[in-house]
């Protein structure tokens, strides 16, 4: 899994240990990968003797993560979730799950910030542009959802 996925997984495991709630792992195979993100996460958990409650490995985007995951949850009588994702991705993820009828408690991780007060921090750099691309994608995704379109 990617570093982003690992960060989310680590926080999900922390919350699982604190609450005893079951874990639903969601994520399809990125690009031409043979194994889905959800299957890769499940393998990591099993190495540490943690069995996921559900593994949803068919989704291709955030909307499908919600759509397919909610099917598993509703079959088990679950209508409220702690939703773990990066802070910058949570608004779109929460919206997607709420549109599927879930009561969502956001559980953000992966906050990106740099502190500093010098003038140097006001000069744009390549890392800032890279992070901005995430924000732009999320805002475009939310707009697309509100206009009834799929992922941009």
Model-derived segments and spans:
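A structural signal for short, hydrophobic/glycine-enriched beta-strand patches
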Residues: 1-129
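A transmembrane-helix-recognition feature enriched in membrane-embedded lipid enzymes
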Residues: 131-152
């Amino acid at each position: 899994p990617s570093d982003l996925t690992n960060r989310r997984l680590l926080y999900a495991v922390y919350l699982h240990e604190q609450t005893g709630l079951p874990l639903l792992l969601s994520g399809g195979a990125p690009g031409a990968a043979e194994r889905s993100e959800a299957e890769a996460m499940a393998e990591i958990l099993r190495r540490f003797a943690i069995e996921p409650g559900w593994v949803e490995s068919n989704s291709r985007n955030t909307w499908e993560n919600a759509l397919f995951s909610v099917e598993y949850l509703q079959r088990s009588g679950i209508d409220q979730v702690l939703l773990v994702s990066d802070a910058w991705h949570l608004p779109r993820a929460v919206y997607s799950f709420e549109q599927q009828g879930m009561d969502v408690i956001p559980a953000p991780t992966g906050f990106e910030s740099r502190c500093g007060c010098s003038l140097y921090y006001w000069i744009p750099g390549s890392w800032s542009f890279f992070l901005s691309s995430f924000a732009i994608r999320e805002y475009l995704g939310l707009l697309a959802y509100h206009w009834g379109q799929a992922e941009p």
